[in-house]
């Protein structure tokens, strides 16, 4: 996404663990710390892994409660995915919502469509998962009425938005916006 500079912290060779490795790690941590509670710290949990790991946790009867960070995905428009996630112990998801305006999402290079966001929120909520959405106002090029669209989106979907965190846009030093400020109408002053 054009606002993000997380990729600067990744070193060459970063990779996602395979499902079998994750299952082994969960068992190890359960035994070592006598815990059922897990936070998978991936700022954008891959949809295929979300689907596969949820199913495996159920199959392995791990009896855990877990959370992670997700993007809204068109590949997750299947109610069974959310039922499996809940059955596996998923109880809370942090979603990168960013904006309730399609044009602004496109400026941010987010492939997400607003109808997919609504569907993901509804399905996960109906499955019993708490939804926390994160967004911000003031992205370069966003108009006042487009910022209002975010408020209206949240109000329209309040039955399925359980908590939220909004802030003002902060230009990250290594974000694509910082690398190409003129493309986004950003100018530096000294």
Positions of the model-derived regions?
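Short beta-strands and strand-loop turn motifs
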Residues: 5, 38-41, 66, 133-135
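Short Fe-S-cluster ligation motifs
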Residues: 25-42
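A structural motif corresponding to the C-terminal lobe/cap of the Radical SAM core domain
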Residues: 16, 58-190
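Canonical Radical SAM [4Fe-4S] cluster-binding loop centered on the CxxxCxxC motif
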Residues: 1-18
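Active-site-adjacent beta->alpha loops and helix N-cap segments on the catalytic face
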Residues: 47-50
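Conserved beta-strand positions
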Residues: 6, 40-42, 95, 166
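Alpha-helical packing segments of well-folded alpha/beta enzyme cores
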Residues: 25-29, 53, 120, 150
